[in-house]
């Protein structure tokens, strides 16, 4: 078996395939494992760290929770007070307008109820005419049609920290699907892996030993007959790997650049080609003291402002210093980068005056722009009004001896680390089921 990608999806697939007794090789173009899970330790004081990629784990995300515990990793609860909400007041100064951001989510859900009821009649099937009609509208168009007030519009803009897309870019189906789910749409109880989320990827990689090859990029795939032949590039040298099955976990943003012989089915090709990835800039700011802490105040905030959403990135760690994590999605990613280009990190610090940033010194910082990462080309997938909803199942559909995984293939947990883990384990189970039936 060959697994393309050593992110959580690929490593989870390899973990289960090894348990089934398969011989597994994993390749990844990066010089590390983890993919879009990236724990940053270098440069921070007091041996602190924070997540520059996948960060929070919800308590109902069973697959990643079970896998972490299976590997002996502890989950630490974080952000117990949930998210607050920040927006500009009449004088254009940011201020905390809601101690509980869930109220904004509730108002959106209430306004969406007529659309949600219809969507549920279709049993939330994306191949239904109902879903297709909903999906053709952008969130911005729906806000205009329903004469949404400024508060509701600001909440929708703030969701770019969740979907990584602005209301003009995001299909209404994304909101409707989120609020139609049985679980609470707003964030609930949240955790991180103690010591860093990258410990999960590292633990999964240990059994692979010499069967893990980093700095090895997939450049072509041929799938004829009873096997798959994968062309890879390593240190400018081309070679080929033959395998019985290929688990392809690369994001669609990268996958669509890889030639397949023969070509993938037309619907699958179109699904991969059309799927969009959100702009996402993650900035980690370490301060000399945790000035943002105050009685009754949340440690996390959503906002429609240039810095995006922010939260305490290391509340579970000791030390006087503390790290604020800023996630700027969609247009906020561009705005955050502009601030840093013109003013340096000090510009972001000034943008946090409302939180009390003048009461501490910035001692270290790190920024990762995921749309500039050649092996991600974005934070994670989102659905725009141009995506044909009937194509969504094709993202996860096996093709001959190739199975597909990655957060973009998950139905319930698309965009989450749990979606990556779940999809990788599903891909391994699909190979087992296919092999047993032959």
Where are these regions (language model features)?
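FAD-dinucleotide binding site
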Residues: 1-438
């Amino acid at each position: 078996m060959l697994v393309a990608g050593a992110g959580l999806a690929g490593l989870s697939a390899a973990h289960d395939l090894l348990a089934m007794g398969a011989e597994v090789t994993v390749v990844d173009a990066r010089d590390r494992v983890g993919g879009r899970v990236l724990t940053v330790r270098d440069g921070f004081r007091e041996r602190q760290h924070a997540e520059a990629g996948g960060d929070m784990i919800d308590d109902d995300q069973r697959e990643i929770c079970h896998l972490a515990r299976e590997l002996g990793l502890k989950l630490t609860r974080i952000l117990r007070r949930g998210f607050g909400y920040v927006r500009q007041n009449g004088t254009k100064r940011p201020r905390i307008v809601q101690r509980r951001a869930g109220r904004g989510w509730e108002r959106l859900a209430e306004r969406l109820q007529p659309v949600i009821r219809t969507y549920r009649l279709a049993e939330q099937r994306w191949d239904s005419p109902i879903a297709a009609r909903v999906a053709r509208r952008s969130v911005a168009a729906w806000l205009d049609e329903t004469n949404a007030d400024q508060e509701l519009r600001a909440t929708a803009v703030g969701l770019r920290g969740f979907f990584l897309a602005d209301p003009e870019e995001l299909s209404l189906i994304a909101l409707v699907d989120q609020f139609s789910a049985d679980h609470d749409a707003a964030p609930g109880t949240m955790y991180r892996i103690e010591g860093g989320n990258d410990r999960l990827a590292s633990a999964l990689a240990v059994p692979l030993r010499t069967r893990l090859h980093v700095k090895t990029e997939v450049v072509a795939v041929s799938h004829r007959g009873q096997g798959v032949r994968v062309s890879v590039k390593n240190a400018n040298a081309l070679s080929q790997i033959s395998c019985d099955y290929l688990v392809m976990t690369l994001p669609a943003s990268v996958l669509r650049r890889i030639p397949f012989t023969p070509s993938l089915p037309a619907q699958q090709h179109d699904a991969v080609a059309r799927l969009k990835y959100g702009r996402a800039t993650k900035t980690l700011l370490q301060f000399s003291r945790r000035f943002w802490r105050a009685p009754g105040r949340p440690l996390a905030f959503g906002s429609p402002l240039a810095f995006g959403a922010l939260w305490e990135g290391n509340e579970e760690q000791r030390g006087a210093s503390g790290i604020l994590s800023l996630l700027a999605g969609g247009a906020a990613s561009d705005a955050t980068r502009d601030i840093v280009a013109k003013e340096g990190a000090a510009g972001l610090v000034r943008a946090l005056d409302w939180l009390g940033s003048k009461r501490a010194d910035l001692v270290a910082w790190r920024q990762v722009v995921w749309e500039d990462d050649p092996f991600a080309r974005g934070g994670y997938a989102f659905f725009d009004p141009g995506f044909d909803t009937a194509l969504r199942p094709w993202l996860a559909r096996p093709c001959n001896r190739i199975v597909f995984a990655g957060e973009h293939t998950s139905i319930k947990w698309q965009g989450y680390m749990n979606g990556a883990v779940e999809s990788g384990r599903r891909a391994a189970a699909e190979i087992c089921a296919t092999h047993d039936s032959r």
